[in-house]
């Protein structure tokens, strides 16, 4: 098998695993986490909602763009994949260091830095997109990244329909109402998973939580880019 065929096989296996229904244990964990979320003060809910709203607005406006500084156009997809893996690890370390600092101060200090934690994750997506050769100065590519973020933290119910939009992006992007998308974006993210971004909330704490969640986001992005590129290549 060629390198591209191996990457396609890996991506398809990931897709099958990703789209499966949550296990009984995962559903139980989600119910427990939901109970925890219900005890979180309304003030924190408001900060989370506003943080996501500002993240979406900044991304759509292009005010938070960051790109990979080196030209990767001459690299093979396999080489880009290895570079992407190293990039994810690098951002994991940054996120973990931030999580350790905020986690030590409890949930109220953590929520104060929540926008920064979101920013780290979006910077990771911008960098990965740039590595794979996509132009993040293009507004539609930035929307694509928001969808990838949304997919990584989507609920079991909305996962398949969202994945379908991403998988058929070249067609779907023509029919998306960007204003409605921006208004509804927050509602489609699984609140349970969103609160897991907060150090000190959920099964993992502080730096560990951020390290794992950045890995989850990075792996989702990496495989989505593989599927997109290989599909476009096959269609040429």
UniProtKB/Swiss-Prot annotation:
Pfam families for this protein: EcsC
Entries under InterPro entries matching the protein: EcsC (IPR024787)
Domain of life: Bacteria
Described function: Unknown, does not resemble components of ABC transporters.
Protein name: Protein EcsC
Originating organism: Bacillus subtilis (strain 168)
Species classification: Bacteria, Bacillati, Bacillota, Bacilli, Bacillales
Gene of this entry: ecsC
